[in-house]
């Protein structure tokens, strides 16, 4: 014993050795119990049965772990309603759309998968592939066009059946579908929009190419400058782990106002794992009886399923096709010649043509726009947005390091 009643250095080392030995014995016992539990009860020896009886706490812990793993696996599985069940549910959804006084639509990556843009948590989603250590690939994002779901939402808004759209997507397809900008809140930004934050109000520049080529998490400058004040422009993307502060195109003010007025919310293609963290979108300050009725279209489990008045297990395009038919509304066909982005876009100034190497959108697929310095149309390598999967990759690295 050291002077003063404390342990000597050799005693502390001996105590540490004993602690480590006990931990290793506990881990070995845990491994033994785990191996036994994987056997069928009839195949266990008497000695193994005795060990399980003596290790009730470990058995309970391992069985709990197994249940949690199975629960997580089930949540990741995609479930499809059979055609008749889906039609029945769509009829119910159509009734809710007709009777809604203020319908707000929340959209996620699942509505753009038909445009060859992967979602995040599906079987081939960005998160899923990164967690498995597999590369993320996609078709060239500049080749993506608004899907049947995008065009249906625009038509519903035109007929005053949808009042506002809140989107997590950065692909700009809602804008390109003809939905008015006042009716969209792109909470995580738009790959076609860069802004000058020095100008008051902020000056927006809509482009016909992906402006995020040089940007990433916490690095938002695009390399171009404001035509008015000369300040460096920045993209509008909100990466995982960032907080969006721009007025547009995030349009949080309109999103929260729409949510506060909503009596019905339709969630399309969103896992809701991010949106659930935005309490302003769910009217959680209201008593449950006064909150909006929730309708969810997703192939997988979402954390809001228990709150939903109806959950439809189906692909967004399939559900929206049935819904529009039930409502007696025609689904407009996307026409590149009428894409609003071309009338909204600010052209590059002289000397800026080489400021990006992304493929530019053009009304005709035959020829690139004049002076375009972007990648050729038949590029063999998919060109992904600077925003695409960046935050995911960063998080995956942190998890691996941990």
From Swiss-Prot:
Residues 9-25 have a biased composition (Basic and acidic residues). Residues 1-25, 59-78, 355-385 are annotated as: Disordered. Its EC number is 2.3.1.286, 2.3.1.-. The active site is at 188 (proton acceptor). Zn(2+) binds at residues 196, 199, 226, 229. This is NAD-dependent protein deacetylase sirtuin-7. Residues 83-330 form the Deacetylase sirtuin-type domain. It is an enzyme of class 2 (transferase). Interacts with UBTF and the RNA polymerase I complex. Interacts with components of the B-WICH complex, such as MYBBP1A, SMARCA5/SNF2H and BAZ1B/WSTF. Interacts with ELK4, leading to stabilization at target promoters for H3K18Ac deacetylation. Interacts with histone H2A and/or histone H2B. Interacts with DNMT1. Interacts with SIRT1. NAD-dependent protein-lysine deacetylase and deacylase activities are activated by nucleic acids. Histone deacetylase activity is activated by DNA. Protein-lysine deacylase activity is activated by RNA. H3K18Ac histone deacetylase activity is inhibited by methylation at Arg-390. H3K18Ac histone deacetylase activity is inhibited by deubiquitination by USP7. It holds the Pfam family SIR2. NAD-dependent protein-lysine deacylase that can act both as a deacetylase or deacylase (desuccinylase, depropionylase, deglutarylase and dedecanoylase), depending on the context. Specifically mediates deacetylation of histone H3 at 'Lys-18' (H3K18Ac). In contrast to other histone deacetylases, displays strong preference for a specific histone mark, H3K18Ac, directly linked to control of gene expression. H3K18Ac is mainly present around the transcription start site of genes and has been linked to activation of nuclear hormone receptors; SIRT7 thereby acts as a transcription repressor. Binds 1 zinc ion per subunit. NAD(+) binds at residues 108-127, 168-171, 269-271, 298-300, 316. It comes from Rattus norvegicus (Rat). CDD domains: SIRT7 (cd01410). GO terms for cellular component: chromatin; cytoplasm; nucleolus; nucleolus organizer region; nucleoplasm; nucleus; site of double-strand break. It is found in: Nucleus, Nucleolus; Nucleus, Nucleoplasm; Chromosome; Cytoplasm. The modification Omega-N-methylarginine is found at residue 390. Keywords: Chromatin regulator, Chromosome, Cytoplasm, DNA damage, DNA repair, Metal-binding, Methylation, NAD, Nucleus, Phosphoprotein, Repressor, Transcription, Transcription regulation, Transferase, Ubl conjugation, Zinc. GO terms for molecular function: chromatin binding; histone H3K18 deacetylase activity, NAD-dependent; metal ion binding; NAD+ binding; NAD-dependent protein lysine deacetylase activity; NAD-dependent protein-lysine depropionylase activity; protein methyltransferase activity; protein-glutaryllysine deglutarylase activity. The modification Asymmetric dimethylarginine is found at residue 390. Its main location: nucleus. It comes from the Eukaryota. Phosphorylated during mitosis. Belongs to the sirtuin family. Class IV subfamily. The gene is Sirt7.
